[in-house]
């Protein structure tokens, strides 16, 4: 969102990720849906863990939406559950990005080591969810 993905992409390779995608036009929920669909799993995202740029939530609460919002909801909405999450945060999770961060799926046993290595390189990361058995995406 505020830095290029090259350093993070290079750092994660040594940890043998299960999946990596850049969060761009489909927004976080759309790309999580793609990851879940193509991998035959479910993705559970923690709403409280999502990084949000300063001022973005306030704009979403005021009803500001991008043109991609309805298209992303149409693309992934049938497979995405957002019950109990504010509409403003849901809108941000569907918001298309031109240069979003990476959505990385790592086996739990390697996640903490990657977090340490990324931190040592000065990379921002947030653990925002888990992969589970099932299908679809749940933002809770």
Describe the function of each predicted region.
Residues 1-12:
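Active-site glycine-rich loop that binds ribose-phosphate moieties when present
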Residues 14-140:
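Glycine-/charge-enriched secondary-structure boundary and capping motifs
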């Amino acid at each position: 969102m505020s830095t290029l993905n090259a350093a993070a992409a290079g750092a994660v390779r040594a940890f043998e990720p299960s999946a990596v995608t850049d969060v761009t036009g489909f927004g976080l929920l759309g790309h999580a849906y793609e990851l879940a669909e193509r991998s035959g799993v479910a993705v559970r995202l923690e709403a409280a863990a999502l990084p949000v740029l300063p001022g973005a939530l306030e704009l979403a609460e005021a009803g500001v939406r991008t043109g991609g919002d309805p298209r992303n909801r149409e693309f992934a909405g049938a497979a995405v559950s957002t019950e109990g999450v504010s509409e403003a945060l849901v809108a941000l999770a569907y918001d298309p990005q031109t240069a979003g961060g990476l959505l990385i799926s790592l086996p739990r046993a390697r996640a903490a080591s990657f977090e340490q290595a990324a931190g040592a390189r000065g990379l921002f990361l947030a653990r925002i969810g888990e992969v589970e058995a099932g299908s679809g995406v749940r933002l809770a």
